[in-house]
Amino acid sequence: TGFRRSIDELKIEDFLEVYNTNVFGLSLFTKEIVPFMKNQKSGTIINIGSTASLKGYATGSIYSSSKFAVRCLSQCWQAELRPFNIRVCQVNPSEVTTAFANPERVERDEVHNKLTPKEISHAIISAIEMDNRGFINELNVWATNPFN
């Protein structure tokens, strides 16, 4: 969920819509699964962030700040859950050819220089498959040449 608005056009309702999904929804879901992972004394949580969580951009106040919040939650949960052998990894994709920005949720055609869900799934699988002795705290997945 994302809104592109300049600072003078920001509305609290837009912040709430994005934060309800990206921050509060993630937090509530994670709160529900953590007891099961603690009980089994292991687990891996993958949070999908965005490269927007690494650096803000013009008209990105709402979306970027929500992904910065996800990044902070991931870091807090890493520290909190490591004693229980629960790994938390945040995956930060750059632009991916999905229906993300389409209000009708129509999938976009694959673009030769943008990432696809396949690349992101490979990153997620690599983080999950790592031996439990280690964990990847954050993966930044960039399109090689998105400007071509």
What does each model-identified segment do?
Residues 5, 32-41:
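A short helix-coil junction within the Rossmann-fold of NAD(P)-dependent oxidoreductases
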Residues 5, 90-105:
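Short beta-loop-alpha junction of Rossmann-like oxidoreductase domains
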Residues 50:
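Residue(s) in the substrate-gating loop at a strand-loop-helix junction
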Residues 84-86, 90-91, 106-148:
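C-terminal helical subdomain
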Residues 55-61:
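Active-site loop immediately N-terminal to the catalytic Tyr-X3-Lys motif
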Residues 30, 66:
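Active-site helix of classical SDR
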Residues 1, 8-27, 46, 70:
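Catalytic Tyr-X3-Lys loop
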Residues 55, 76-86:
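Active-site-adjacent segment of SDR/Rossmann-fold oxidoreductases
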